[in-house]
Amino acid sequence: MPFLELTLSCSEVTLPRFQNALDDVGALAVTMLDADADTSNERAILEPGVGEMPLWDRLTMTALFDGDSDALVVLAALEAFDPGLDWSQVAFRMVEDSDWERAWMDLFKPMQFGERTFIVPWNHALPEAADTPEAAVVRLDPGLAFGSGTHQTTALCLRWLDSLAGSGELQGRSVLDFGCGSGILAVAALKLGATHAVGVDNDPQALLATADNAQRNGVDAQLAVYMPQDEPVQTYQVVVANILASALDALADTLAARVAPGGRIALSGILHGQEDDLLKRYAPWFEQLRCERDEDWMRIDGVRRG
């Protein structure tokens, strides 16, 4: 079945008006992307707080309508909400259902992190390299923009977990995934040999996503999720926190207290240039601190002092 696709450039200020207009004329789906993606002006938006919806300054909005929708009706609705609309920033085209499916498949493909960790979308066959007893395969819904493995902050953590598994430091361990998002790190840790994991996030939707992904991957009996205020006060042998540098700084005492003596910690969500302050911040509790870089992003990991 064909669909009518609208592409529109807008700003954070004009976005609400256009959203209302598109809803009024029957948009089936609306997506927003950073219009400055892959440029020097690209701005990363990671884990927002509850009730927050941070957006880019310039956006590319794509809306999908039934194939028999009238493009002129859509244009009239847009003009009613913004008479000064720049029509050169508006484009329509007809797309087949298969085009969307193919684009989806092309965008999200199986990914390997380290020697044995694979993130595989549900709509993909298992790659040959992952079809071995040693492989740790995490199946994810490719609709997850953050926490799908495609961002460097997540990739840095997945490679770290894979390296722990390779050295035998994850088998039989307990894991805390602080700022769990989709739960990809907690689920991967369990697939790599950890016996129990806890996911903590201040977004209730993230906890639902984590629980759902754990169930789909058959590790739900080993994983519990909590809001920060409800998390049991205990220590873990492995702690990973993929949040923002400002939050890592503010939560240093809390995160350090969650790591058992001799346990391992990984901190991610750190832009290059922010790592020195965080290294100093965590040095009182951790030794063997080191950094790994992936493009503009850094990971810090270390061992809890005894």
From Swiss-Prot:
Species this protein is from: Xanthomonas axonopodis pv. citri (strain 306)
Catalytic activity: L-lysyl-[protein] + 3 S-adenosyl-L-methionine = N(6),N(6),N(6)-trimethyl-L-lysyl-[protein] + 3 S-adenosyl-L-homocysteine + 3 H(+)
One example GO MF annotation: protein-lysine N-methyltransferase activity
Subcellular location: Cytoplasm
UniProt similarity note: Belongs to the methyltransferase superfamily. PrmA family.
Chief location bin: cytoplasm
Covalent S-S links between cysteines: none
Any one GO CC term of the record: cytosol
Name of this protein: Ribosomal protein L11 methyltransferase
Matching InterPro entries: Ribosomal_L11_MeTrfase_PrmA (IPR050078), Ribosomal_PrmA_MeTrfase (IPR004498), SAM-dependent_MTases_sf (IPR029063)
Signal peptide range: none
UniProt cross-references to HAMAP family, sorted A to Z: Methyltr_PrmA (MF_00735)
GO biological process, one term: methylation
EC number: 2.1.1.-
Upper classification of the organism: Bacteria, Pseudomonadati, Pseudomonadota, Gammaproteobacteria, Lysobacterales
Superkingdom of source: Bacteria
Binding site for S-adenosyl-L-methionine: 154, 179, 201, 242
Entries under NCBIfam families matching the protein: prmA
